[in-house]
């Protein structure tokens, strides 16, 4: 037995009431130490342990009750990290600003260290060996002796030592804290070191059997302690975190919901029951606007692979780092709402500010106080085709807008979700080329393009490991390049693709942190397309492109590409109607009724192979409250999966929205006959 000199012991078996709070029992002194934040009691190595949430959990022992020692001491604990911390995270610490006291914990890669103040110098002793996350319990211990120095152990074995001598400068007026730093640290592995702010986080995982001795245990005693308390089952009761489950109804339409991620993360959010929007389709995929990605639209495949995107990014003024939706960690500015939701289409509005991680909005006007904001409208059709129409309310000379990004679950790297032959690009002429990330597919400098690029590209596909794959259609003049940061942000030892974990879902104040392990949700940017933007009459920048999911080959999407960019002429043959335009913003023909007569509409589309009509949509303004019967080349179609209509509410008589499933490469006559609706 090695309990001689034991001065504090938290077995973490249970919590007890302590006034209005909860407490854990320190059994040597039979004392109650308050536990703060969100936590769970789970199976430990012996009896129970405490699952710390990674955000708020900490056990506090008041300074007056904490063990006081001027010389030798030992600390030990059993831990099972769910994820590595953002930087060093204390298992036990009683220190002041790294000037007094001691700190015992693990770092962002799972190294174990004892740090302390010796003769007013902060000394660190850290292992080269790492404790694993998710898969195994680890026993960690460290000893200090004022003559011999520091020794650190993992699973009973010495893994690091530092010869040093001197007087321990004890932080006697500071509370002892378990599971959380007393001195906040910025995240490690930052992309931009100047965007470095102290982060508030706790240990993320299970802590059990915490002990402090007022003497140095020998190596033999540390091994005995490990063997005596070693559990029969070394795998801790941890489950891999998964992105939200998405209900599939098999019916096209949008709905508000509150998507669940994992309990500790969900607990943070001060939101109601309907913050998120999910769009269902007959096919087994989804489009998802979730607060965990700050409400950008995610394309989610039939097997649960997520692809997100960038927002408008840019601006200056009194801001630090990137100003974009990713920096709005708590969604203080970003929100979504459903504008249209009928059988023919869904329209979702996303509004957000271009802010930094301190929530400062970029390029604030000194007179009005308004900075950079953006509105985006996603017009979504039953075939999985959506138009992203963006309006950037800013006066800066330029903004980026899109970076198709693979979102990786904990336990995954990008290679688990996308093939190394990651991108296929095409143009209207049918030139097609696939690019591999086995080696970077271009020179690799910031903003540099592909080797052997496709000329005048307007179509690309991400080659996900799924049946349905994300695709994008752009207007002429778009430059499609590999991720714009190039190899500067690539860590080849980790992945073929640049990968970060400051976004999504993360709550740390960081605009860029490299993923060091597959312990958290991470994102891997694949492309940085640059679609054209133009100033509208108000001076706002405006643009659009198509994004969607399809199980077709890229060559089979070229007709859709041609339709959006070179839609066939529409000619009114019958009825008091006027053609306004083909709107790329809505991916639809806009037709207006000229007077209040409730008559039929007949028109032709002059379709051809160069100018086809692929699953066309029509918005008939002022149609009224009635439905419609459709004839195509004289043949009547009943409302079904191939002919859908719905109404768009407006101040004036309702507008009719019609969608047809079909590909037309020859002229076609279409009739819409009013039908009274009951």
Where does each model-flagged region fall?
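Secretory/extracellular carbohydrate-interaction modules
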Residues: 80-88, 268-272, 330-339
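Beta-strand-rich N-terminal accessory domains
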Residues: 236-313, 458-487
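C-terminal beta-sandwich/jelly-roll accessory domains of carbohydrate-active enzymes
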Residues: 555-678
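Acidic (Asp/Glu-rich), glycine- and aromatic
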Residues: 365, 385-427
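Extracellular glycan-associated modules
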Residues: 1-236
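Extended, loop-rich substrate-binding clefts of extracytoplasmic carbohydrate-active enzymes
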Residues: 318-389
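Surface-exposed beta-strand/loop patches in extracellular or lumenal glycoproteins
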Residues: 402-407, 459-466, 473-477, 484, ...
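Beta-strand-rich recognition/accessory modules
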Residues: 251-252, 260-264, 453-574, 651-675
């Amino acid at each position: 037995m090695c309990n001689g000199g034991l001065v504090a012991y938290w077995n973490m078996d249970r919590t007890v009431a302590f006034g209005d709070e909860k407490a854990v029992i320190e059994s040597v002194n039979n004392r109650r130490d308050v536990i703060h934040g969100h936590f769970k009691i789970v199976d430990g190595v012996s009896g129970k342990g405490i699952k710390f949430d990674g955000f708020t959990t900490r056990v506090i022992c008041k300074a007056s009750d904490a063990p006081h020692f001027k010389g030798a001491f030992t600390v030990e604990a059993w831990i099972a990290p769910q994820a590595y911390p953002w930087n060093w995270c204390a298992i036990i610490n009683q220190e002041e600003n790294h000037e007094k006291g001691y700190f015992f914990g693990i770092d962002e890669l799972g190294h174990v260290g004892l740090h302390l103040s010796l003769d007013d110098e902060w000394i660190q002793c850290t292992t080269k060996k790492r404790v694993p996350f998710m898969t195994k319990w680890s026993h960690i211990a460290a000893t200090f002796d004022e003559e011999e120095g520091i020794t650190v152990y993992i699973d009973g074995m010495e893994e690091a030592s530092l010869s040093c001598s001197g007087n321990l400068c004890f932080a006697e007026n500071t509370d002892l804290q378990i599971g959380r730093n007393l001195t906040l640290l910025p995240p490690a592995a930052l992309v931009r070191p100047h965007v470095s702010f102290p982060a508030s986080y706790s240990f993320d995982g299970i802590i059990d059997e915490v002990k402090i001795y007022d003497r140095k245990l020998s190596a033999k005693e540390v091994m005995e302690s490990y063997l005596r308390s070693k559990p029969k089952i070394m795998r801790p009761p941890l489950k891999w975190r998964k992105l939200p489950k998405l209900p599939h109804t098999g019916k096209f339409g949008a709905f508000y919901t509150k998507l669940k991620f994992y309990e500790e993360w969900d607990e943070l959010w001060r939101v109601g029951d309907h913050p998120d929007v999910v769009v269902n389709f007959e096919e087994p995929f989804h489009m998802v606007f979730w607060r965990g990605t700050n409400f950008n639209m995610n394309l989610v495949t039939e097997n649960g692979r997520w692809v997100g995107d960038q927002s408008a990014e840019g601006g200056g003024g009194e801001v630090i780092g990137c100003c974009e939706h990713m920096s709005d960690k708590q969604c203080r500015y970003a929100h979504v709402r459903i504008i249209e939701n009928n059988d023919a289409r869904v329209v979702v509005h996303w509004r957000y500010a271009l802010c930094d991680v301190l929530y400062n909005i970029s390029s604030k006007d000194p007179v009005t106080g308004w900075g950079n904001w953006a509105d985006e409208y996603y017009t979504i059709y039953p075939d999985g085709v959506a138009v992203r129409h963006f309006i950037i309310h800013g006066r800066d000379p330029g903004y980026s807008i899109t970076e198709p990004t693979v979102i990786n679950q904990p336990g995954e790297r990008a290679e688990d979700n996308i093939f190394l032959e990651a991108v296929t690009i095409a143009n209207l002429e049918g030139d097609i080329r696939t690019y591999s990330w086995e080696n970077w597919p271009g020179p690799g400098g910031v903003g540099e393009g592909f080797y052997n690029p496709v000329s005048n590209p307007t179509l690309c596909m991400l080659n996900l490991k799924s049946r349905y794959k994300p695709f994008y259609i752009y207007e002429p003049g778009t430059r499609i390049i590999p991720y714009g940061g190039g190899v500067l942000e690539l860590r080849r030892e980790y992945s073929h693709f640049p990968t970060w974990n400051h976004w999504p879902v993360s709550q740390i104040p960081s605009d860029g942190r490299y993923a060091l392990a597959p312990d958290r949700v991470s994102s891997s940017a694949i492309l940085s397309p640059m679609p054209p933007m133009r100033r509208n009459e108000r001076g706002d920048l405006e643009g659009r492109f198509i994004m969607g999911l399809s199980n077709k080959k890229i060559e089979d999407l070229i007709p859709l590409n041609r339709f959006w960019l070179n839609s066939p002429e529409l000619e009114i043959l019958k009825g008091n109607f006027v053609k306004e335009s083909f709107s790329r913003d809505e991916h639809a023909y806009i037709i207006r009724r000229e007077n209040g007569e409730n008559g039929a509409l007949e028109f032709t589309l002059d379709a051809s192979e160069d100018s086809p009509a692929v699953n066309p949509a029509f918005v008939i303004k002022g149609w009224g409250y009635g439905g419609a019967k459709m004839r195509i080349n004289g043949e009547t179609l009943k409302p079904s999966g191939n002919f859908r209509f719905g109404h768009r509410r407006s101040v004036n008589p309702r507008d009719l929205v019609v969608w047809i499933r079909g590909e037309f490469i020859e002229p076609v006559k279409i009739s819409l006959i009013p039908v009274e609706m009951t």
